[in-house]
Regions:
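C-terminal transmembrane helix and the adjacent membrane-cytosol boundary/short C-terminal tail
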Residues: 2-5, 10, 199-210, 214, ...
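Residue-level recognition of membrane-helix boundary sites in multi-pass small-molecule transporters
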Residues: 128-131, 177-180, 195, 209, ...
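Membrane-topology segments of multi-pass transport proteins
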Residues: 1-22, 28, 56-88
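Membrane-water interface segments at the C-terminal ends of transmembrane alpha-helices
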Residues: 25-67, 90-171, 182-203, 231, ...
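Glycine-rich helix-loop "coupling/hinge" segments at transmembrane-helix boundaries
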Residues: 153, 251-279, 313
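Short hydrophobic, aromatic-rich alpha-helical segments embedded in or entering the lipid bilayer
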Residues: 68-85, 179, 260-274
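Amphipathic cytosolic juxtamembrane alpha-helices at the membrane-cytosol interface
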Residues: 23, 179-181, 205-238
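Transmembrane alpha-helical segments of polytopic membrane transport and secretion proteins
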Residues: 1-31, 124-130, 299-313
Length: 313
């Protein structure tokens, strides 16, 4: 027994070292992309935030030499002058409200349409459902610039829709250069990804569960809300978060289809940076958008955590 004890101890040590070596090997394999992200994304973000706090020296000196209306600090931590200026600006508050409203409304419409298409495909499976799914995915292959311009030309005051109404002697609606036009274009551009995510989640629900619910007397509505949607909850949350993050920071769609004022913060950031030569205020807006997107991303992180927990269980 005493002779075998050292060998058992050595074996146990080897078993402990193997997971450690594997984790270290995995960390080394993942380090190159992490370093690239830190160098080309994380470091510029740190510089931009420092500039927004009034640190205009170092690598921010070139931008500070040509920028206007800057808030410069002598304190080590910076100054909140730029944040105070932007957050108290009535125009920024109005555009922030428009951005949040467009994001919430567009994301809600996208989710409703995506779930309708996904459920129709799952519960019927006919050629009409497959055709509807294919048509819903078509905008995925159309560039956002072309899609935005097409929506504008369709709903513009001199666009296709009003021309058709004019042929019948009617006054057609005008959605071009309006917030409603921005919502329509956002839904058009965001729907394909949401359809793919929701359809994959709904299709993954086992037929046995649906049949069991029907055998128990559950109707279509009860089966949908009690079985299908809870089982596909994680893909639905992922679709909602990606859609919301994509809309809240968008530039092309509101730039082409929206009004000059009020507009979304993506357009405001570009205007302040290029047209007004006020990059410090533009970065403050970017920080606000980043904070809002981070709040949306919390739902995505929670959904992934829940999915991993359920898979581990």
């Amino acid at each position: 027994m005493s002779a075998g004890a050292p060998s058992m101890t050595v074996t146990a040590r080897r078993r402990i070292r193997r997971p450690r070596s594997r984790s270290l090997r995995g960390l080394l394999m993942a380090s190159p992309p992490l370093l690239l992200v830190a160098a080309f994304t994380g470091f510029p973000i740190v510089l931009a935030v420092a500039y927004s706090l009034g640190h205009t020296g170092g690598l921010n000196q070139t931008t500070a030499l040509i920028a206007q209306h800057q808030h410069i600090t002598d304190e080590w931590w910076g100054t909140l002058g730029a944040y105070r200026e932007v957050l108290t600006n009535p125009r920024f508050r109005r555009d922030l409200g428009v951005t949040v409203m467009v994001t919430v409304v567009s994301t809600s419409i996208v989710l409703v349409l995506a779930l309708i298409i996904a459920l129709y495909l799952r519960l019927t499976g006919g050629w009409a459902a497959k055709l509807l799914t294919v048509l819903a995915i078509v905008p995925q292959f159309i560039p956002v610039v072309i899609a935005s311009w097409s929506v504008l030309m369709f709903y513009a005051p001199d666009g296709f829709l009003r021309s058709v109404f004019a042929q019948a002697g009617l006054e057609g609606p005008t959605f071009g250069y309006t917030v409603s036009g921005v919502v329509i274009a956002q839904v058009w551009c965001s729907l394909p990804f949401a359809v793919l995510m929701c359809a994959s989640g709904v299709q993954a629900v086992p037929d046995a569960l649906i049949d069991a619910a029907r055998d128990a007397g559950a109707g279509l509505v009860r089966t949908t809300f009690s079985v299908i949607l809870p089982m596909a909850f994680v893909p639905i949350v992922i679709a909602a978060t990606f859609t919301g993050i994509g809309i809240i920071g968008s530039f092309t769609v509101p730039y082409f289809t929206g009004p000059n004022a009020p507009t979304m913060l993506g357009v405001d950031m570009a205007n302040y940076f290029t047209a007004y030569n006020m990059p410090q205020q533009s970065i403050v807006m970017a920080v606000v958008v980043f904070g809002a997107a981070s709040l949306i991303a919390l739902a995505y992180i929670w959904a992934n955590f829940r999915s991993s927990k359920e898979a581990g269980a």
